[in-house]
Amino acid sequence: MKKQRIVVKIGSSSLADSHGGISKEQLSDHVAALARLKEEGHEVLLITSGAVAAGFSALGYPSRPVTIKGKQAAAAVGQSLLMQAYTEEFRKYGIVTAQLLLTRSDFSRKEQYSNAYATLGELLNRSALPIINENDSISLEELTFGDNDMLSALVSGLVSADMLMIFTDVNGLYDKNPQKNEDAKKYYFLPEVTEEIASLAGDAGSKLGTGGMKSKIDAAKTALSLGVSVFIGTGRGQEKFVDVLKGKGDGTYVGNAPQKEIKMNKQWIALHSVVSGQIEIDAGAATAIIQHGKSLLPAGVTNVSGFFKVGDVVEVMTQQGRVIGKGQCTYSAEELREIKGMQSQHIQARGERHNYEVIHRDHWVSL
């Protein structure tokens, strides 16, 4: 089997025991299956939930806390317990683990984003297994936004993974809720995530997790857009992840032939950057960018809105107000207002700092 880079996401419901805590049996089962992937020569990254589940009982909560401060306190205690449990299990297979705790803001800051990319790359080069969780004790997003589903999609894109496996307590996607409808039809393969498929998923999560099927479908759509194929399902035993790669997984495969992967810098611009202003361009410039893949030149700029610095990300819109993309600007807003609409030779004649492009095509993404 060809060596692949695999991101596996394990949710709280796939780790929990009957009391809502972490099941050692479940965790051991997952680790054994992850070790088999490594044994087959694949590179593996693990996105794991479960910090709250691992920590709430140690703080005296009778069940998973419902308040934000309770969840974050439980996560602060549980993260070290969860990591300790993983480390001890992986040690049995001679696998070195590494912990990364991320927040959504780490993705929006380009320097942190680049550092995460470099760190993960070095860990994989050293045959370590990165274990990634959202920093639950200080981050609100993981506790209210998808049980790490979207984090797993973003990480899979960041590392140019071949496949994202989202493991949960439901064996795939259905056209109806299978727990309430006996005639529910299971989707074994979906070439893409359509609006119809997205509308079928409810928001409700399981009792022990925060991510329902909707968050998993959203994550699958994001991963597919980044060139990563997806599996959503369940399974038990040492071969369950290897079986997914063989097409025998108990769930739904999403995505047809792999799409072209998106470079790290363009991923950051498309998904994580903060827009600092807007640039309006004429029809000729819009055609050159969209249809011919050209860079944006000062001559095509008709208006500048906002206050931004060199290197900030701006939206680009047509004169009819339609946003067509965004990119990193090589001029500040003040500089661009001075030279908008001017030909390159006229800018040079002014004797001012001159870049041929306002936005280079390597730092541009279409929307």
Curated annotation (Swiss-Prot):
Protein known as: Glutamate 5-kinase
Pathway: Amino-acid biosynthesis; L-proline biosynthesis; L-glutamate 5-semialdehyde from L-glutamate: step 1/2
Cited NCBIfam families: proB
One BP term from GO: L-proline biosynthetic process
Statement: the UniProt record of this protein carries the keyword Signal: no
Family: Belongs to the glutamate 5-kinase family.
Matching HAMAP family: ProB
Subcellular localization, as worded in the UniProt entry: Cytoplasm
One Pfam family recorded for the sequence: PUA
